[in-house]
Amino acid sequence: MLCQPAMLLDGLLLLATMAAAQHRGPEAGGHRQIHQVRRGQCSYTFVVPEPDICQLAPTAAPEALGGSNSLQRDLPASRLHLTDWRAQRAQRAQRVSQLEKILENNTQWLLKLEQSIKVNLRSHLVQAQQDTIQNQTTTMLALGANLMNQTKAQTHKLTAVEAQVLNQTLHMKTQMLENSLSTNKLERQMLMQSRELQRLQGRNRALETRLQALEAQHQAQLNSLQEKREQLHSLLGHQTGTLANLKHNLHALSSNSSSLQQQQQQLTEFVQRLVRIVAQDQHPVSLKTPKPVFQDCAEIKRSGVNTSGVYTIYETNMTKPLKVFCDMETDGGGWTLIQHREDGSVNFQRTWEEYKEGFGNVAREHWLGNEAVHRLTSRTAYLLRVELHDWEGRQTSIQYENFQLGSERQRYSLSVNDSSSSAGRKNSLAPQGTKFSTKDMDNDNCMCKCAQMLSGGWWFDACGLSNLNGIYYSVHQHLHKINGIRWHYFRGPSYSLHGTRMMLRPMGA
């Protein structure tokens, strides 16, 4: 930038020098002068022509000029030429002097111009520096503002990232706290389960000890039964001899039966004669009307009785009458009750013989007896009705067609057809052909002896889905009892019921 004024000054000097050279150009000869000008880092070279000095032409030799006469003729002409040359030379010297003055004036003017340019150049340089500083300041301010904006943006981003990291940290702390609480809860549960396991282990050890004691007791009972068996065997031998004696006496009695028949014949004839005598008498003889005989409650219902209560029936091939409770109101009446549970007043943990003959009060809790039910169901097809009541007031009933009970030799096996009920479609009663079991007669098709484990006598098929003769549990104690009064598809396998009834009626009655 500092070289531009110098270049301008040197250009002006060049123009002046070229103008002077042009003024002297026509007179210039073959010689030239070289002038070099340097201004700062720039240099300039000027080539100026130098005028030649004109020399007189050499005088020819006299021989060439044709003798002395020709020289004498040409001498005035040479002098004339020299005079012109001197006049031209003086004129040229004057012009050179003028050009030098012009050059000196131009040089002074150029020096003044240089000084003016330097002064102006300083002001321009100061202004240029100020403009440059202002531009740089503006640029730096713009850069600073841009940097500030970028810094603010980065600060906002960092603040957002910091907030996000803080939120994630709080979330992780919350999750760790929840995990810690969950871990503490699991530890407490594991501790409680460990304590419960220890308690169960202690109870299991107690049960094992009790089981060992029971096994020892059962072994002692088996030994006692073995001794009793041997005693019975010896007694059986004694009874065999006694039976032989009785047989001999029976033959003797049969021989005497003929005489008894004769006496009976005579007695019959005497009675007939007595009847004829009484018939011939004038006084009338009142005869009692024979009392009607019923084989079940349905026949009593057909006779016109409509009140539920205890009645007497006479079953086939039975020598003594049987008292039964007749329900004359439920579903048309005529039902003969064979089982009733309502308050736990009767213990149903009985032997085979007791279940065979029956026990309890027929007006309340009782079991009619397997033998009576067998004789009752052997003469015709019967309908079995089972009624169930729970502790919440709900009740249901199930009916089975073609119910029949086998003989004692058949272990009072169960025979029923399909059921219809409000307790679900599935059947909780034992399947066809299941035998009756008690605590002293195991017919349950299981090594576990269900009658002893679940209590009572019932048709157990590998312990099965029902037992209406189990232990009677009162309210608030009836839950989680597998040895209670249960019917699986009514209230589940461990709910002990409030009351039950089982009753029979001939089909079609």
From Swiss-Prot:
It is found in: Secreted. Residues 181-269 form a coiled coil. GO terms for cellular component: extracellular space. Widely expressed. It holds the Pfam family Fibrinogen_C. Transmembrane segments: none annotated. Residues 1-21 form the signal peptide. This is Angiopoietin-4. Disulfide bonds join 297-326, 450-463. PROSITE patterns: FIBRINOGEN_C_1, FIBRINOGEN_C_2. The lineage of its organism: Eukaryota, Metazoa, Chordata, Craniata, Vertebrata. The gene is Angpt4. Residues 416-436 are annotated as: Disordered. One of its GO terms (molecular function) is transmembrane receptor protein tyrosine kinase activator activity. CDD domains: FReD. It comes from the Eukaryota. Residues 288-508 form the Fibrinogen C-terminal domain. Keywords: Angiogenesis, Coiled coil, Disulfide bond, Glycoprotein, Secreted, Signal. Homodimer; disulfide-linked. Interacts with TEK/TIE2. Binds to TEK/TIE2, modulating ANGPT1 signaling. Can induce tyrosine phosphorylation of TEK/TIE2. Promotes endothelial cell survival, migration and angiogenesis. Glycans are attached at residues 105, 135, 149, 167, 256, 306, 317, 417.
